[in-house]
């Protein structure tokens, strides 16, 4: 489904064995978290809000693993940053929660910009933004002079999202 045709962005998804495995992990673990949160936060005035935020986070993660367009993947990637910010700052009345949420958003947002640059370069080198088509041209992409910068930019985004050294706090 064409989403932003002038930029070559399509609303496309791809389900293979690996994507299915991760989708099942996301929904399975997400369901367990829902059950736990319901018991742990029973009677909490904002229980409905935590459920909405957990659904947003889970849906964003599903979008990341199922997206077949690099820029669509980026949109879902950033939605995980936003939902993480909202979940970390769930107890927003506490200054510590607000500070931690902002710090997480700043770090993951900065890494997301690096990832976006890497994905745009990848699309330029590969001639498409469709991940399934890019996979076919892997050898040509690895042979390109921009391969190392592309790899480092995408890894920077992944490392900031997963709080890998030196992006952990």
Where are these regions (language model features)?
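...captures the hydrophobic TM-helix bundle architecture rather than a specific catalytic motif
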Residues: 1-169
